[in-house]
Amino acid sequence: MIGPVHPYKGGIAHYTDLLCRALREDGNEVQLYTFKFQYPKLLYKKPQKDMKSSGFGTNDADFCIHTLNPFNWIKVAGRIKKQKPELIILQWWHPYFAPCFWSICKLLRREKILFVCHNVFPHERFPLDRLLTKWTLGCGRYFITQSKMDARDLLSVKHDAVYRVTPHPTYGMFCKQGMSMQKAREQLQIDQVQRVLLFFGFVRKYKGLQYLLEAMKLLKERDFKVQLWVVGDFGEDKEEYVEQIRAFEIGDQVQMVEGYVPDDEVEKYFAASDLVVLPYLSATQSGIVQIAFGFEKPVLVTEVGGLPDVVTNGKTGYVVEPRSAETIAEAIMDYYINNRREAFVSQIEKEKDRFSWKTFVDTMMEMVRRD
């Protein structure tokens, strides 16, 4: 299997670690190949590794892939070939990896190749992305997509793809301490009776934070008291959000925690919150939803991409119009005024099997064995 793993940052590194563990628990022998060099600083200026966290159980990965060195790709392909694999699994999420992955796959063209598609196309599109994606995914035989939208995108570049659509599994591994809401709020110095919303993860333009801040303004105008925590690394200048908070006069309602959150600190933010909000403008699927479900936290998402596939409106959370501060504000008020928490949590518990890693692995292996 090829993909990022700990100590690389981000949800896909967590995902690769957990998929490896699930495949091994299913009785498969798995060798992980990951990056010794992932992105140049020109593309990713901040530190790419999180050395503070302990990871989630895979400590035998081979850090051998240099994404910009063609001679390295030949060497890596030879190393994989010597293992005589029955199946090669690659994590796919961005065309930056196209030259590297295409070359390795072409050198291993006689092997069975499966791509796990986190996004068939990148969130932030650019002129050559479709060509690079078609070029690389054309090397694959099998595909896992995690939303119906991504399946449609896949078929637009690979008409004969053998694929399955199965949802992103739940991230339950952050619940290390079983931290109570009371303890989490004590650590974060949040009043125990405060209403608390959470926006978590890398802050990007497509994630729609500006509409959530506008919703906070509407709630203030309606004298509905609630506190929003924005926790994560800003991939762009945060000043526009700071200015928006200032203009809306909601500084007393918004707490910003800037920076990448180490794995060991994720728990307290989710444990302290009532509702996790993802006001995205575009999406295929989201690991943040599955972190929230791992903590049995309801979510508020927008009706974009694959988010409605995993959130059942009125049962495990809310699905609202994108780019609409009004519908976000209305859903937040409904959650608290009508005390939806208990009913939503009960439904989240019932859907655990649907989002389990075992279900994911069973779906993947059934596809490969049937073909």
Q: Each PLM stretch: what is its role?
A:
Residues K268-S286, K297:
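Acidic donor-binding loop of glycosyltransferase active sites
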Residues G3-K9, C20-K82, D150, L155, ...:
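N-terminal strand-loop element at the rim of the active site
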Residues D191-K207, L213-M216, W229:
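Conserved donor-binding/catalytic core segment of Leloir-type glycosyltransferases
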Residues P298-V301, V311:
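Short hydrophobic beta-strand element within catalytic cores of glycosyltransferases
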Residues Y241-D264:
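Nucleotide-activated donor-binding/catalytic signature segment of Leloir-type glycosyltransferases, i.e.
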Residues G138-M181:
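Donor nucleotide-sugar binding/catalytic pocket of nucleotide-sugar-dependent glycosyltransferases
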Residues N313-G314, Y318-A325, I332-N339:
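Conserved acidic donor-binding segment of nucleotide-sugar-dependent glycosyltransferases
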Residues K36-Y39, F200, Q227-E240, G259:
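Glycosyltransferase donor-sugar binding loop
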